[in-house]
């Protein structure tokens, strides 16, 4: 919990799997951050300047911005419900991705490989 921010840097993959309640947001500056729980990234906005991989089901409410890309993996159905402005595109590599708003998939291309 708390008001701090989580920052992911470095080329490696970091997986967050627990439910977290921090509110200061998440910054992904390098590598890949995998969220395997819709509550893994707390309640703040996500600045994705690398790769955010969502390997989970449920509804992801956090706003996603930045120049990075979003990958939906795993077999579950995930709904993006935030007003997202990320520009790096969206890749669906597994499961189903539902956009509940026009802005949910950011402004980049969408590639469906599922």
Model-based region annotation:
Residues 1-2, 13-67, 79-114:
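Surface-exposed loop/turn positions within long extracellular repeat scaffolds
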């Amino acid at each position: 919990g708390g008001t701090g921010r989580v920052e992911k840097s470095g080329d490696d993959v970091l997986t967050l799997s627990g439910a977290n309640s921090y509110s200061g947001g998440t910054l992904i500056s390098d590598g890949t951050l995998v969220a395997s729980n819709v509550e893994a990234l707390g309640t703040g906005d996500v600045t994705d300047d690398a790769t955010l991989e969502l390997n989970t089901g449920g509804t992801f409410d956090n706003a996603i911005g930045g120049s990075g890309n979003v990958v939906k993996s795993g077999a579950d159905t995930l709904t993006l419900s935030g007003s997202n402005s990320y520009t790096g595109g969206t890749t669906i590599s597994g499961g189903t991705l539902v956009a509940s708003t026009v802005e949910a998939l950011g402004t980049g291309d969408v590639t469906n490989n599922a």
